[in-house]
């Protein structure tokens, strides 16, 4: 999601929503309304789908709480807390292994996978192509993991057509806190969400193919971590972080422990003429995990960590995990002023000036390093 414009447009949209009480939840859902929250400081409110789109067009970040509302309320009533392994993240110590696996990362494979993803008219969460593109990703992951022990690939069904996917290295200690890498697989054209052309090359084809390639490289290398290492491919990020909210809430309700969650969303662009960096988001993240990522960037990447910046409320899937109480981080393609201006339209392609495969590769390197280093402790 994009998060840089002034919020005046958002306030115009907010004035039109329904201030119905949450106590009328089931009745409002039956009317087709959605429960929306736009900041920690404001109460949730009801909005139509069209009003939700108005918020998106105004670049107003929000959670759509509708799908997880009852589950989260149950967590509060029962006093369920996120299980987090609170430990100091280790200094990088697996240099030989990390660099060996990094050397096998292939931009040509990422290019090929992205060509397939962008060939779908769009990957909107309710569209047939949104569903079929998710199935294609699932099949790629299943093929990569075929015949390998200790690895599972599963689909995560939602109330909408597009499924999320979880590919998992079970780890020697299956009950240990998991290292999670996440990306969203959906795309959107804000002019015509359900049918408009939305190649979503950078948002978020890049993060998706990064994680497919990292998963492949780890499987090929015979990666066998000490703890679970998971790769999540989330449906429906563009419309209120629906997929990641569902999975994060499920992990909390199920008592699953998390060591770190690292989100890749847009990794392929930096503004021509700007300094090439890996930007680290500072809001709704774990500061200790950010510090650790800086050490990995210094050790394993060819470009530096950039000036930290805030991306805004509910800007991407890391926020779902942070809200549930888990440590999360979000390395991003560029500082806000240098991010891709072509997203959420038919122009989000690899041909735009500023798109760079060598830049995107740096994020695959970072994810590989984090998987090996964090998965080994």
What are these model-predicted stretches?
Residues 112-170:
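A non-catalytic alpha/beta surface segment that caps or lines the substrate-entry region
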Residues 161-164, 195-288, 317:
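Acidic/histidine-rich catalytic neighborhood of metal-dependent amide-processing enzymes
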Residues 96-105, 119-129, 151-155, 193-204, ...:
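Second-shell loop/turn segments in exported
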Residues 122-125, 158-162, 171-175, 185-189, ...:
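Solvent-exposed loop/turn segments at secondary-structure junctions
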Residues 1-21:
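Fungal secretory targeting signals
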Residues 69-127:
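N-terminal hydrophobic or amphipathic helices/low-complexity stretches enriched
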Residues 270-377:
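Active-site-adjacent substrate-binding region
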Residues 18-86:
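Primarily auto-inhibitory N-terminal propeptides
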């Amino acid at each position: 999601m994009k998060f840089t414009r002034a919020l005046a447009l958002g306030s115009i949209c907010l004035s039109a929503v329904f201030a119905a009480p949450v106590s009328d939840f089931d009745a409002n859902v039956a009317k087709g309304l959605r429960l929306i929250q736009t900041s920690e400081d404001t109460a949730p409110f009801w909005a139509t789908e069209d009003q939700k789109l108005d918020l998106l067009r105004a670049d107003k970040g929000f959670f759509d709480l509708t799908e997880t509302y009852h589950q989260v309320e149950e967590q509060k009533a029962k006093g369920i807390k996120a299980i987090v392994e609170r430990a100091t993240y280790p200094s990088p110590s697996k240099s030989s292994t990390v660099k060996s696996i990094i050397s096998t990362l292939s931009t040509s494979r990422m290019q090929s996978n992205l060509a397939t993803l962008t060939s779908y008219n769009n990957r909107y969460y309710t569209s047939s192509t949104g569903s079929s593109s998710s199935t294609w990703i699932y099949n790629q992951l299943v093929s990569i993991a075929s015949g390998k022990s200790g690895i599972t690939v599963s689909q995560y069904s939602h109330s909408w057509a597009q499924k999320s996917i979880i590919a998992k290295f079970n780890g020697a200690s299956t009950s240990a806190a998991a290292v999670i890498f996440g990306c969203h697989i959906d795309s959107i054209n804000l002019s015509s969400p359900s049918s408009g052309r939305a190649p979503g090359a950078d948002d978020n084809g890049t993060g998706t193919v990064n994680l497919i390639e990292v998963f492949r490289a780890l499987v090929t290398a015979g990666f066998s971590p000490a703890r679970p290492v998971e790769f999540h491919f989330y449906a429906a990020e563009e419309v209120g972080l629906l997929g990641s909210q569902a999975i994060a809430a499920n992990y909390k309700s199920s008592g699953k422990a998390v060591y770190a969650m690292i989100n890749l969303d847009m990794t392929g662009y930096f503004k021509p003429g700007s300094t090439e960096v890996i930007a680290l988001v500072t809001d709704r993240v774990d500061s200790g995990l950010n510090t650790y990522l800086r050490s990995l960037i210094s050790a394993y990447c060819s470009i530096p960590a950039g000036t930290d910046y805030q991306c805004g409320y509910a800007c991407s899937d890391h926020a779902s995990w942070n809200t549930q109480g888990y440590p999360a981080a979000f390395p991003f393609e560029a500082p806000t002023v240098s991010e891709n201006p072509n997203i959420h339209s038919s122009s989000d392609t690899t041909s735009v000036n500023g798109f760079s495969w060598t830049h995107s590769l740096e994020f695959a390197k970072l994810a590989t390093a984090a998987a090996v280093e964090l998965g080994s402790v």
